[in-house]
Amino acid sequence: MLNIKTKKKNKKRIYVFNKNPEFKFKHLVFQKNKFILKIINEIDKIDLMRSEIFNSTLPIDPQTGNILVRFRKLNRNRLLAIKAIIQAMLYHFNIKTKKVTASVEQLADECGLSTVSKSGNKSITRASRLISQFMEPMGFIKCKKIKTTNNKFSKEIILTPLFFMILVKNSSLSEGDTHLKQEFKILKNKNVHINSSETFAKQEILKKIINKYSLNKLKKLGPKKIKEKINTEYKNIKK
């Protein structure tokens, strides 16, 4: 009797199916705001990993308002994915309403973050988790559930001032030519209020609070008391 030895193949589990997600838009002229187009084109020059806002902002659970103790930070794969998502959100951004005019599924498709199984089932989990478990708790976006015509729920995405702050603070975009500066002023006037001095000052105060207290103490304080401390400290500075 022959002893046939079978070699077991070491199959590595694939955690990320597309390691290099990239935003690919269909219509070149959809977004006409020159300032936003410049951000889209120069997203690779923005160093999000070293961002003071990224490193000092406390993630807040949008449902409960509590600080998220266990929170997944950016790694290389998530960084590439978030840059692609940022580009897509900006591309579909309506300045008047502050809303993204694309669904999560559309954003996932355009960024290469959606997958289709062998059975034909589509998954947009990677994009939806990035939006609901990272961008929203960090305060970069706000999500609202809306009822669609087929009685299902979809997410309405609103870009916050912090979303733009992180992009402008970590790039040379604010040092651009006069025309782009004018575009940025127009963008601010159209209900996207970005008070850079106040926001930056409050982020610095927040950073000091984080360094001063332990994680358990911060959790006990809660977002409301932390916000009160920040506002009190900011008023004292302005006196």
UniProtKB/Swiss-Prot annotation:
UniProt KW Iron keyword: no
Pfam families: IncFII_repA
Disulfide bonds: none
Taxonomy, superkingdom: Bacteria
Function: This protein is essential for plasmid replication; it is involved in copy control functions.
Keyword Acetylation recorded: no
One GO BP: DNA replication
Name of the protein: Probable replication-associated protein repA2
Family membership: Belongs to the IncFII RepA family.
Keywords annotated in UniProt: DNA replication, Plasmid, Plasmid copy control
